[in-house]
Design a protein with these regions (language model features):
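An alpha-helical, amphipathic repeat domain used for nucleic-acid recognition
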Residues: 1-161
Length: 161
């Protein structure tokens, strides 16, 4: 199989095998893994290159998503699976966990605090929201124990609004 590339718009590079489009990557990735046009590449080497491209795309998407707001590990993985294969999504989540950019414990504490203090939600509702986002039950229990909402006072506050 003969590998060639074409520059796309912006920072995109299109990779072709035997003059047929296969996949798009970034100029940064291509600069790091450059192969001259016309290089003969084996099926195994091609599959490794495609996997590296997919892993980089998943990692970039994870960084982009986490730059907007916090996510639970499950929530981030689910979003990555919309555009990435499971292996690439899992690797990106693991890298974000290792780097400390993803922490379900901290996320649960912030989410519970926001829901109870700012939104005036009950502990039950906060638990449901955390479970919906894929946070482990034990982590939710600890976050709720730290917050200890007063549901009676919350109900009074809502009635008096």
């Amino acid at each position: 199989m003969r590998l060639t590339h074409q520059l796309g718009r912006g920072t995109k590079v299109h990779l072709l095998l035997d003059d047929e489009y296969q996949i798009t990557t970034s100029t940064t990735f291509w600069a790091e893994h450059y192969l001259p046009d016309g290089t003969e590449i084996s099926e195994d080497d091609w599959q490794r290159l495609v996997q590296q491209i997919n892993e980089r795309k998943a990692l970039n998407k994870a960084v982009e998503l986490l730059s907007h707001r916090d996510h639970s590990a499950k929530e981030l993985r689910d979003k990555l699976l919309r555009t990435a294969d499971p292996a690439a999504a899992d690797k990106a989540v693991a890298q974000m966990l290792d780097a400390g950019y993803l922490d379900d414990e901290k996320y649960a504490r912030r989410l519970v605090r926001h829901l109870i203090e700012d939104k005036k939600c009950s502990a039950y509702h906060a638990r449901q929201e955390c479970q919906k986002r894929g946070i482990d039950r034990e982590i939710i229990d600890r976050a709720l124990a730290e917050q200890a909402p007063d549901n009676v006072q919350t109900a009074k506050d809502l009635i008096l609004r």
